[in-house]
From Swiss-Prot:
Biological source species: Methanocaldococcus jannaschii (strain ATCC 43067 / DSM 2661 / JAL-1 / JCM 10045 / NBRC 100440) (Methanococcus jannaschii)
Gene this protein is translated from: vhuG
Name of the molecule in the record: F420-non-reducing hydrogenase vhu subunit G
Enzyme class: oxidoreductase
Oxidoreductase among keywords: yes
Residues spanning the signal sequence: none
Entry EC no(s): 1.12.99.-
Length: 288
């Protein structure tokens, strides 16, 4: 264990602050590592005016959505020894990445130019930074040293990464898939039809995918402990692709194709299969 405090920075770009909350969910475990951390930049808990030089580890939550995000990520890289993509939005684009299914102008016009009780029917220009054309993960702009996936990452994964760095080791990610962590019984059969999550009442012991629910545990990196399938909710792929996969959605589609015509019944396939990872997909935006 090192003796000098590590200078740490944290920031939320295009994200929801869920990764920061997951860090707090370490509870007493957080107290074990705090003495070795000097948090020098964290806008979510303080009001710093600028990013200081000489940061050892910078945890970046959120992807790149506007020009201000892009400016910050370059400054963070310049002033930090280690940059960690903290959570799925930073690593793969996350839920905001589904905006890539539309042109920037379409999104702005729908949100701001459609009259409602909440806006004046005009697109703000002075109050907010201009949007980039598409959402992108931070690795598209800078070198990322390590990734902690998840929406949000589990407190254990965050703790393991921090402790590894404090000990001078490299954080390691699970190499298995969610199905390997799932306690449900599998018979290795494909469903004859697919259901929406709210349809029917699944058998609490059988594999959700084999019951016809579009569970993506077979294509998603492990590490969550299969929390969603264990609770009766199909995996949606928030931990992203495995090391052996180039594209979570394409990998999932390839497996689903084995179900034949039943797979054609699945609605909104792009948003389902790349819900958290569209900006990182091989085809990651609306075609011109």
């Amino acid at each position: 264990m090192i003796t000098l405090a590590v200078k740490v920075g944290m920031i939320q770009l295009c994200g929801c602050s869920g990764c920061h909350i997951s860090l707090l969910d370490l509870h007493d475990k957080l107290l074990e590592v705090l003495p070795n951390l000097e948090i020098v930049y964290a806008p979510i808990i303080a009001d710093p005016k600028e990013i200081p030089e000489g940061i050892d580890v910078f945890l970046v939550e959120g992807g790149i959505r506007n020009e201000h995000d892009e400016h910050l990520i370059h400054e963070i890289r310049e002033k930090s020894k280690i940059v960690i993509a903290w959570g799925t939005c930073a690593a793969y684009g996350g839920i905001p990445g589904l905006g890539n299914l539309y042109k920037k102008e379409e999104l702005l016009n729908y949100v701001y130019s459609t009259d409602s009780t909440e806006n004046k029917g005009e697109i703000p220009s002075e109050e907010i930074p201009p949007l980039e054309e598409y959402v992108k993960p931070i690795k598209d702009f800078i070198k990322v040293d390590y990734t902690i996936p998840g929406c949000p990452p589990t407190p254990k994964m965050i703790a393991d990464a921090i402790i590894a760095l404090l000990n001078g080791e490299e954080p390691k990610l699970p190499t298995k898939i969610v199905c390997d962590e799932c306690p449900r019984k599998k018979e290795n059969v494909f469903p004859e039809t697919f259901k929406r999550t709210h349809e029917g009442r699944p058998d609490p012991e059988r594999c959700l995918f084999e019951q016809g629910y579009t569970c993506l545990g077979f294509a998603t990196r492990a590490g969550c402990g299969a929390k969603c399938p264990s609770a009766g909710v199909p995996c949606r792929g928030c931990f992203g692709k495995t090391d052996k996969s180039l594209d979570l959605g394409a990998n999932a589609a390839n497996v689903l194709a084995n179900a034949g015509e039943a797979a054609l019944e699945i609605p909104d396939k792009v948003a389902l299969l790349n819900r958290f990872t569209l900006p990182d997909a091989l085809i990651n935006r609306k075609a011109k």
